[in-house]
């Protein structure tokens, strides 16, 4: 099995991370900007302060499409990690459940229309959805874009809308 044919990962599990915890643990220059956000892009790849290359493009796309989003870093601390390979690395997103329906449409548009991802491309991402009671569920996906809909559907199922 080559690195390009690795096994798909699709995981849904509880998480202890919440928006309140992020705001309370952040430096003041970061926490003040997070309070009104619906989505926060978190550092990725096991680093406290490193984001995947393209994170700012993702941030801009979400904001331009009505999703109030920020990154969990100050401008001075923000660093990107470029991973070269045949894979799209989007990162980790914590999402308030109230915006899930809109977020799912916008992030799908970003993946298919902006990144031009094809069905046989690989993609890696993690969505963490916090419901109105403050409970967070994490959905992690690493696999072919053609199978991404199961992760998007899992996120949609966590929406506060009935």
Please identify what each model-predicted range represents.
Residues 2-74, 131-132, 138-139, 145-148:
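Membrane-active, amphipathic/fusogenic segments and juxtamembrane/transmembrane anchors
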Residues 54-56, 84-86, 151-156:
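Surface-exposed beta-strand edges and their flanking turn/coil or helix-capping segments
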Residues 67-71, 98-100, 155-157:
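Short, surface-exposed, polar/charged, turn-prone segments marking secondary-structure boundaries
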Residues 71-78, 162:
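Short glycine-rich, low-complexity/disordered patches
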Residues 76-126:
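Membrane-inserting effector segments that mediate pore formation, membrane fusion
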Residues 110-162:
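Amphipathic, membrane-active segments
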């Amino acid at each position: 099995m080559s690195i390009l044919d690795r096994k798909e990962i699709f995981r849904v599990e509880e998480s202890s991370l919440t928006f309140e915890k992020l705001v309370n643990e952040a430096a003041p220059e970061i926490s003040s900007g997070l309070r009104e956000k619906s989505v926060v892009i978190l550092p990725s790849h096991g680093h406290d302060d490193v984001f995947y290359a393209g994170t700012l493009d993702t941030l801009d796309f979400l904001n331009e499409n009505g999703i109030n989003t920020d990154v969990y870093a100050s401008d001075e601390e923000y660093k990107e990690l470029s991973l070269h390979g045949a894979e799209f690395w989007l990162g980790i997103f914590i999402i308030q459940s109230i915006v899930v329906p809109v977020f799912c449409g916008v992030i799908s548009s970003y993946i298919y229309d902006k990144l031009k991802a094809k069905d046989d491309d690989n993609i890696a991402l993690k969505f963490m959805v916090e419901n109105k009671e403050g409970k967070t569920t994490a959905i992690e996906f690493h696999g072919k874009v053609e199978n991404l809909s199961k992760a998007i559907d899992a996120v949609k199922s966590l929406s506060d809308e009935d």
